[in-house]
């Protein structure tokens, strides 16, 4: 079984898919990375924690997770939280775990207060530490978004 999550970036007039998270069968659990540097110990990576969290409750086969990091560390954009949430979603799909959206949210909350935001497939307003979510009627259709990463570290821990 193989799973991957592709992020689609609008560049010019086209949309270009970039595989940002890939999960493949392996003899033992492993994490590999490419793209931007990810500081810290591998065991502290939220993708690793997401796998081990689900492994406590489900009989998961060993896998290799490959993460292509495109959101800068410390940007305050929830890059690690989104990686964790999408790992949960992808594992749920690949292993046919049939975890409900509500339970995925509960698992995500154990990984970080803003991880639940990335389980949702709609625009949400996050308040508190990011754990209180309210749907809002908003679309990015026909809008441009500019994201600026100043030369400062924004910790979301």
Regions found by a protein language model. Give the residues of each.
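N-terminal, positively charged, Ser/Thr/Ala/Gly-biased leader segments
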Residues: 1-34
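ATP-dependent small-molecule kinase catalytic core of the GHMP/sugar-kinase superfamily
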Residues: 1-10, 96-157
């Amino acid at each position: 079984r193989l799973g991957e999550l592709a992020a689609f970036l609008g560049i010019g007039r086209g949309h270009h898919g970039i595989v940002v998270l890939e999960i493949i069968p392996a003899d033992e659990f492993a994490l590999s990375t490419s793209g931007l540097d990810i500081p810290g110990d591998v065991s502290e990576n939220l993708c690793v924690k997401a796998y081990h969290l689900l492994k406590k409750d489900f009989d998961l086969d060993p896998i290799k997770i490959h993460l292509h990091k495109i959101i800068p560390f410390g940007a305050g954009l929830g890059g690690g939280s989104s990686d964790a949430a999408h790992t949960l979603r992808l594992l749920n799909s690949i292993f046919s775990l049939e975890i409900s959206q509500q339970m995925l949210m509960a698992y995500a909350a154990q990984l970080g207060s803003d991880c639940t935001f990335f389980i949702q497939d709609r625009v949400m307003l996050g308040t508190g530490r990011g754990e209180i979510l309210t749907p809002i009627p908003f679309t990015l259709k026909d809008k441009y978004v500019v994201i600026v990463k100043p030369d400062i570290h924004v910790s979301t821990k």
